């Protein structure tokens, strides 16, 4: 009886939440409600939605990953230490990647350090975290392998990404080209690119990626628990699945980081798909024991 009651309460709460979210989004997307970047501002102190949602995404992902690490028999003190270093490297990598592609917009080092205002790139974060994880495992010799750690990391990363993308929503960024589709999103003129200043409605690409990230999280979670044979397989699948969605969605975005005439995210995603697919085939065909990886 208690289980049934708990299920009904969760179902009712979830239904109310999604109804509220639908109504709220419909009003924002139509332009009836204009968003603020700030949760509140008191004097010189301000709390932004962007940084809050990034932090929320990290914390939820961290606790899910920690539970999985415990089930894997991993020393949790070592795991927490790796996460600490990985987060620092991830933030530095995410910001550095973004700033390097937008140097002309940063007049000083202080401007480049204002990560709470937005401007983090997931590819830079992943590169920074993976490099740090590799060095940590090589130097500290913990109770887990590098690929075991990356599997834990990438199995929950899409969940954090799905939540963090809503920070772009409140910043009116990471949207796509103009559209007249029923789910079009109103963007105030100050946030529109100059070439699209006469358009009012755009593709909500932040929402597309958030939904895709959530789907990737569920797919990787199922694979992690039921089908994984070798450490590293989940990491390879993350590279493939996330990158497939990113390549498609990036085609619509108007604020992409560029390498010449090529969108950097699409180029790097194509490389990750190739590496991930190749790595997955090698790992699945290997006869070595799981621990070797």
Curated annotation (Swiss-Prot):
Compartments (UniProt record): Cell inner membrane
Record-listed E.C. numbers: 2.5.1.145
Pathway where this protein functions: Protein modification; lipoprotein biosynthesis (diacylglyceryl transfer)
Biological process terms in GO annotation: lipoprotein biosynthetic process
Keyword Cell inner membrane included in the entry's annotation: yes
Topology in the lipid bilayer: Multi-pass membrane protein
CC terms in the record's Gene Ontology section: plasma membrane
Residues annotated as transmembrane: 45-65, 81-101, 115-135, 144-164, 204-224, 231-249, 262-282
Binding-site residues for a 1,2-diacyl-sn-glycero-3-phospho-(1'-sn-glycerol), renumbered to this chain: 165
Primary residence: membrane
InterPro entries, per database record: Lgt
Keywords assigned: Cell inner membrane, Cell membrane, Membrane, Transferase, Transmembrane, Transmembrane helix
Coiled coil: none
GO molecular function, one term: phosphatidylglycerol-prolipoprotein diacylglyceryl transferase activity
Primary role: Catalyzes the transfer of the diacylglyceryl group from phosphatidylglycerol to the sulfhydryl group of the N-terminal cysteine of a prolipoprotein, the first step in the formation of mature lipoproteins.
HAMAP family listed in its UniProt record: Lgt (MF_01147)
Family membership: Belongs to the Lgt family.
Listed name of the protein: Phosphatidylglycerol--prolipoprotein diacylglyceryl transferase
Organism: Thermotoga maritima (strain ATCC 43589 / DSM 3109 / JCM 10099 / NBRC 100826 / MSB8)
